[in-house]
Amino acid sequence: GPLSQSAGHDLDYIAITGALGAMGRKGEPPSPPLNLVGDYGGGTMFLALGIVAAILSARTTGKGQVVDAAMTDGAAVLMSMFYAFHDAGMWKAEREANLLDGGTPFYRCYETADGGYMAVGALEPQFYAVLLEKLEIDAADFPQYDRARWGDMVTAFETKFASRTRDEWAAHFEGSDACVAPVLSIAEAPAHPHNVARQTFAERDGTMQPMPAPRFSGTPATIDDGSDLGIEEALALWE
């Protein structure tokens, strides 16, 4: 396309797909989602999938092909559901006015007494019911999809979550199906019990890093410091 030779970064790529414009708080500039959407989600993942698909095709047809994996294309594909919502009249251009952009009281983050945050994602009725039960809020006061009550619902949730620390709330919701989780920092995430149990992170040479994903039953990933591995040895492992 006309921008193929122009300088740019993740933020620029997703800006022209509608993705960036949908993220952030109402009345404020869009919030950069790190560089996850364009570089990795829209670029690397689609390129990897494209390479695998092209290899499978070559094995079947005997012919190779060029894989054109543009980050703008990939980011646009990631927005497919939201374009469908928009065309069906179910998505507004204004941020924090929709189901999944913080526009609903039961799908957003709330600040806790210690300045931490809890993520609430109780979209389905059964999970919303558990959320209200754990917050000790009468379900009759706040029917889930009564938009006229959402403003008061937000206030009630804010007041509740502000009454305890993040870790206290995490312990309170542990084991429940309220779809509530503590918002952890990069430094904190490796120590979360779920991540520890799954060995989601591993330390190598004093550096904490995520383990490879997805996982394969026949060829599980392992960590090797690679200090004695030369080029020839590395290439031999790929044969």
Question: Residue locations for each model-derived region?
Answer:
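Flexible, small-/acidic-enriched active-site or ligand-binding loops
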Residues: 147, 200-239
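Short secondary-structure transition/capping segments
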Residues: 4-5, 151-153, 192-196
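Short, surface-exposed loop/helix-turn segments at secondary-structure junctions
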Residues: 86-97, 192-204
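Short, glycine-/Ser/Thr-/acidic-enriched flexible segments
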Residues: 124-125, 188, 221
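Aromatic-enriched alpha-helical interface/lid elements that frame and gate functional surfaces
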Residues: 101, 106-176, 180
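Active-site-adjacent "lid/gating" segments in soluble enzymes
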Residues: 1-118, 122
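Conserved PLP cofactor-binding pocket of PLP-dependent enzymes
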Residues: 174-196
